[in-house]
Amino acid sequence: MAENDIDRDAIKDEVDQIFGNRPKHEGPELYQVNDQSSIKHVIGVISGKGGVGKSLVTGILAIELQRAGYKVAILDGDITGPSIPKMFGLSGLHVFGQGDKIIPAQSKGGIKIMSTNLVLENENDPVLWRGPMLMGALKQFYEDTLWGDIDYLLVDMPPGTGDVALTVFQSLPIEGVVIVSSPQDLVQVIVGKAVKMATMMNVPVLGVVENMSYMECPECGHKLEPFGPSHLQEIVDEFKVADLGRIPIDPKVAASCDAGTFESELPEGLIPKAVSAVEA
């Protein structure tokens, strides 16, 4: 059969039959909250790598916004490595359903929280899910949770630029992101990837917070830099992003995260510029 004799209509019919005549998706799916919830602002907290304190910054922002009188919720988007529930004293607790919806957990201060650890039978069980299941969990957490009326939903995103991070950017109405870094030599390359990803997704970068920036001697007040000198100003200059502050290494804060007393023991005013950037 000559090329011009190919029955393209027959081929199309056969393909449609095989795939059930599925509709063609022109772009990524946009997630919608349920009709019993209203969220005014969605802010992402991201990092180019793990272990830099992204969840810590998410928690600080949530608590400071709550203290300022806003209604705040956290969606723990780090599906395979969630840490938010433990920080807020919710270890061992489980969310429950109401019809086909989910009632989120709530911290003592009133911050609503949805996380994988709140649905696992044992919070120490590994989450061995592939991409589609991770995306499905994120969609269900956002759409099916009864958030109520929320001023700020903070999304604690997984580190890096993988599937879940991409889905958050494409499918959630993210208004801006706070990037978390640490004072290591490779940080500029890592932060650069996060900045470029946000730019490619047309999501504004609110600025960069540097965690574990220094230690302050309790006796003399001298600042030590155990992880090397700060690179925050270099990042600000290179990528034209805002300096949202430096967080010191504080053993008391680390201990409160482990003990679940982070919310009540957090010192005020750690990153005021970051809070102001989110409010703006």
What are these regions (language model features)?
Residues 120-168:
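Phosphate-binding/switch loop-helix module in NTP-utilizing enzymes
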Residues 39, 50, 76, 84, ...:
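Residue-level signature of catalytic and energy-coupling elements of molecular machines
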Residues 114, 138, 157, 170, ...:
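Glycine-rich phosphate-binding loops of nucleotide-dependent enzymes
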Residues 41-79, 195, 201:
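Walker A/P-loop phosphate-binding motif and the immediately C-terminal alpha-helix
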Residues 148-155, 161, 173-194:
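Conserved Switch II/interswitch segment of TRAFAC-class P-loop GTPases
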Residues 1-30, 195-280:
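C-terminal lobe/tail of nucleotide-utilizing enzymes
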Residues 34-40:
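Phosphate-binding P-loop
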Residues 71-123, 135:
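Phosphate-binding loop that captures ATP/GTP phosphates
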